Amino acid sequence: MQCVTPNWIRVVNAARRTWGKKPIDHEPSDKFKKKILLAEHSPIRLLEYDFTIENLRQWVTVHLVRHHEGCEKFVHTQRQDINSEVEVITKRLIEVLQEEGLLREGWKERDYMFQGEGNDMDMTCNAQAFINISRKRLCMGCTSPETRLAWKLVIDALREVDSILAEKCVPECVYRGFCPETDRCCGYVNTEAYQERLKEYRSIE
């Protein structure tokens, strides 16, 4: 994962501008970072990270590309005229189906591609996007295990370069202080681990 903007200095100086203060040339304190992330004030949108996810199931990429605020996604195409690996797999499948008389009328080669095939994607997210996506994709009750694991790995990578932002990337129940998914609650909110996570998330120390 790579930071693509001048780190937290840009964030703090944008915040200082709104208060009519002069810019500074050093990173703000950890306490400032935690407070502004919890408050979700607009300057946090200036903090952006690029990352790559490799060998991700195609249908999982579909889950991630639904998010559109504060992020951009670039997924490896499945077009056979560009992706030769996909072309080989698809043609072999069609040969087998043809032998068994299972080809569907009107279908093209691309219609036979597996959604479980591994694919690669790049993403750019600002801090607000990380927070928003985590609320949905870290949920243990409503998110598929595969998508949750993929996003957890993203947050683990983020933690290596920005541990404070990663700390504020939590599932919906931690973010809101209760589980709003009354029909699909996983029970995490009833555990001591949840209370500890909630305390950690809300801390500015």
Cite the ranges covered by each PLM segment:
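Family-specific signature for flavin-dependent thymidylate synthase
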Residues: 1-205
